[in-house]
Amino acid sequence: MGGGDGGAGKAKARPVFSSFMTVFMHADAADVALMVLGLLGAMGDGISTPVMLLITSRIFNDLGSGADIVKEFSSKVNVNARNLVFLAAASWVMAFLEGYCWARTAERQASRMRARYLRAVLRQDVEYFDLKKGSTAEVITSVSNDSLVVQDVLSEKVPNFVMNAAMFAGSYAVGFALLWRLTLVALPSVVLLIIPGFMYGRILVGLARRIREQYTRPGAIAEQAVSSARTVYSFVAERTTMAQFSAALEESARLGLKQGLAKGIAVGSNGITFAIWAFNVWYGSRLVMYHGYQGGTVFAVSAAIVVGGLALGSGLSNVKYFSEASSAAERILEVIRRVPKIDSESDTGEELANVTGEVEFRNVEFCYPSRPESPIFVSFNLRVPAGRTVALVGGSGSGKSTVIALLERFYDPSAGEVMVDGVDIRRLRLKWLRAQMGLVSQEPALFATSIRENILFGKEEATAEEVVAAAKAANAHNFISQLPQGYDTQVGERGVQMSGGQKQRIAIARAILKSPKILLLDEATSALDTESERVVQEALDLASMGRTTIVIAHRLSTIRNADIIAVMQSGEVKELGPHDELIANDNGLYSSLVRLQQTRDSNEIDEIGVTGSTSAVGQSSSHSMSRRFSAASRSSSARSLGDARDDDNTEKPKLPVPSFRRLLMLNAPEWKQALMGSFSAVVFGGIQPAYAYAMGSMISVYFLTDHAEIKDKTRTYALIFVGLAVLSFLINIGQHYNFGAMGEYLTKRIREQMLAKILTFEIGWFDRDENSSGAICSQLAKDANVVRSLVGDRMALVIQTISAVLIACTMGLVIAWRLALVMIAVQPLIIVCFYARRVLLKSMSKKSIHAQAESSKLAAEAVSNLRTITAFSSQERILRLFEQSQDGPRKESIRQSWFAGLGLGTSMSLMTCTWALDFWYGGRLMAEHHISAKELFQTFMILVSTGRVIADAGSMTTDLAKGADAVASVFAVLDRETEIDPDNPQGYKPEKLKGEVDIRGVDFAYPSRPDVIIFKGFTLSIQPGKSTALVGQSGSGKSTIIGLIERFYDPIRGSVKIDGRDIKAYNLRALRRHIGLVSQEPTLFAGTIRENIVYGTETASEAEIEDAARSANAHDFISNLKDGYDTWCGERGVQLSGGQKQRIAIARAILKNPAILLLDEATSALDSQSEKVVQEALDRVMIGRTSVVVAHRLSTIQNCDLITVLEKGTVVEKGTHASLMAKGLSGTYFSLVNLQQGGNQQVQH
């Protein structure tokens, strides 16, 4: 460190050092022990080199003074050769300790760090994530990349630094002991050796940080596109996405070029070594002539000085990794240390002995931190008596959900207080407070684990009986027990394997298991169909007995039994009282809301209510049924049927090690840079042997007796050294800049090609477990980067190594073939050692990377569902799951550390042994007068220094090993043929469509669960220009029809025709331009509202955008926002309410002016007021287009031209509303309508 501190001044060094200590923050006692042993090993390993030089100096002196008395000469050489063998044994032990201990402790600390980081992230308050600080992408990068950076520094860089520091100290000790004059004079040259490395570290670290920050943007774009592939496809926005992605990558590439240049200057300035040799050689010759020192000693000391300086330089070059690691560790620590304003971990605060559950809001002021300029509550008051049910109704954005968010303490009010049992909730212990409340929200968050685990989130220590009881209460027990794996069925990422209704019931079971005093239902039934809704509603009524319940509902029918109904409008309670009282006031807000919701047939109040919700499921439904087992099937298949497993097998073994040539072909446009770079690398390869030759010749000059001759030759060789120094500087800049440019453009090209390719894959591909958005994104981030270093740094290295080896071997054989042959023969031993290490590391890197992906998936999921985790205080549980996912990597790493130790030990000691052999054999050849001392020195220097070059290249092979895997996985993506080609050039591109859809004899099952048949011989025709409604229970196949019309999936048998032409004959992207899709959970992208509306429509004027927004009834609310159409939507549109998102999604579909409009439960998630407006908008838009409407709320589809009733994948009835109702009790439709109205009638009694 000393040199570094001196160079940078104490003030600068201190923070670097203290921040570097954060890397070790996560070590425990065992780690400290391992690190101490590792430290000893690394120091021993470092000192072995100067000791080797000491022994060498003696051998050189023996050899140089000539073989006068053969016998004595041989025995001297032999003794020293034997000493080298002893040294080899010692260095084996040391290097083993160095390799083993550090590798072992690195993994331990990194995994502890990951867990702590995740714990800290989960501890943050909701506000932290609202303020764009912690988008999911960032957390994933930190869990995977940052912790890997730290692990890498601990396992490789720290020991390397210590070893070099020891080598530096040892070398100068040897130098002063043997020849203090030379050492003293040459001491200042150390500074020259260090400065380049040091400056370089500084500049590069800055660049590295900027490059990393730069990649977060393209990363976020990719994450959104992949996680919302259906939306991207249906709006044909692949091009738009790619354009944004490329633009975001452009900046990274520019920074990368700067990095290449900086690298070249830095590495090139190492040419200073040669200049230093020039000086040492000249001064050494004077010492030999005038002070009578021996040539071997002069050589050994000169070598020690340079070796020591270089060791210090390369030790300090690790400093740049240290600063990378410390900034990674700091980033992680910053989160770990951040105490959120609302701290779920804190144990301060009181607990009430017994909670009655009275809730009161008193003069509350509040605005969301991300939009401080739009206050939600100005002075909000509401009292909920203990044990009563209060329903909040009102338009979108009136502040209903905010009430729940404040009560759960996701946020704190800026003024006023929220009280439970008369105590301000800020005074209560947070975990305890949340334990008193059960939250069921509109979009239930499930975790990718089993159903049982999901329910246990409610209460950790619940028994199996309690879980079943909770599931029964939530009406979930029956469908769970029908799944092949029952409660152990895996739910899939974000719960995709389950239908909406199923997810919701699991979420309710989770809340019930908690047996909370206060139950918070945020639209808990809005996503269910009539039947599930009735059951769930009963479950909720049961659950809310004797509890304080706050219900938010759009469907008024569901809340008529509430004790108090609070009607909210723009953040105030406008009316308060029971249903009968409020409905009596004809001009009141409530009675008008109820009238709004009444069915067109004025049949009864609020069919909508009930139904409304139903709706949602519908959508899921189709998936649902299908999905229903999906999970099951997935897991089962994985285990029993082996489907999934097969998938894997077919994919995994097919990753052949890709040909490097193919990678280079991707780089073809940069052929000029490739030529320049390769040429520079070849020349640079030759510099090493040339220098060694001069070096060897120089040693023999020292043993000459004629002073004039010594002076003359010294001058020649000194000039050669200076020339090499200049050449090396220029050549390196050429090499690094050119290869850097190749690498950057290659990375950009690979990322673009991969994403472009992924966006052609059929939707079924995204449904697979291994293709979760998290996994794909980390592949885009990491693999492309690895490939860059493969081309940029490794390829240069390979070329220069090959060039150096060929030149050196040729020279060696020409000068002294006997010795050269022996030396060349033992080189492979060293290489094999490094190679063995590399192969072992390769097989390991695979396993640990797989394990990493598992854990980043978990982390991503946890962050997406932060509110749920917070509300259930289930951070511990998530962390336990995370711990389990770390088990695999832990076992792996233990084996890895053994191999690391053995490999390092063997390769280090073998090198010393080969030196021993060379000297012994060289001595014999000299004794037999086969070669002169000069030839021995030259050959030895040339081949040994080349051995070092190969060894260095060998140490890079670990990166090559990682690289090969990355390249394979990149090509696996690029080579995969999609099963549904979105852009078939032969496909028909319609100018416009009539919109006639004909589905004939279709058999269908979702690819992720081929064993669950959705349709068998299904037939349906949809008339052009007419609206067709699909109704039916969950799982009857409604959404599947929409998936088939969009061609997200292909049927197994049968055909889907549009305008009489098989859908497979169309160019899919051209076809999708004429189809507009509005689904239940609208996907908005991070960007402004305007960007979201024009999404996929490249050209649209301002007027068209506003018209579309007006038609979707969104113009007014958009114009009221502070930034209007330029308002930022946030990640996945979190800044907007459900109704607002939905209207933007509708505007987006309208702007497309589609011939076929698909509405998959488009209004299910809205409250009555927004729903009426949106419904009117949809009715307007549907005129003159083919429309396919999936709805649960039957009131919304009475005006459709044709209503098709589905049951279990078959059409059971079709006709208009009137004709179907006329069938009376025998009709399925009639009974569905009745069910929905019956709901209301019961309510009335």
From Swiss-Prot:
Residues 610-654 are annotated as: Disordered. ATP 1 binds at G394, G395, S396, G397, S398, G399, K400, S401. It comes from the Eukaryota. It is found in: Membrane. Gene3D superfamilies: ABC transporter type 1, transmembrane domain, P-loop containing nucleotide triphosphate hydrolases. One of its GO terms (cellular component) is membrane. One of its GO terms (molecular function) is ATPase-coupled transmembrane transporter activity. It is a multi-pass membrane protein. ATP 2 binds at G1032, Q1033, S1034, G1035, S1036, G1037, K1038, S1039. One of its GO terms (biological process) is transmembrane transport. The lineage of its organism: Eukaryota, Viridiplantae, Streptophyta, Embryophyta, Tracheophyta. PROSITE patterns: ABC_TM1F (PS50929), ABC_TRANSPORTER_1 (PS00211), ABC_TRANSPORTER_2 (PS50893). Glycans are attached at N145, N354, N771. Belongs to the ABC transporter superfamily. ABCB family. Multidrug resistance exporter (TC 3.A.1.201) subfamily. This is Putative multidrug resistance protein. The chain crosses the membrane at residues 35-55, 83-103, 158-180, 184-206, 264-284, 296-316, 679-699, 717-737, 797-817, 821-841, 897-917. The keyword Glycoprotein applies. InterPro entries: AAA+_ATPase, ABC1_TM_dom, ABC1_TM_sf, ABC_transporter-like_ATP-bd, ABC_transporter-like_CS, P-loop_NTPase. Residues 35-324, 674-962 form the ABC transmembrane type-1 domain. Its main location: membrane.
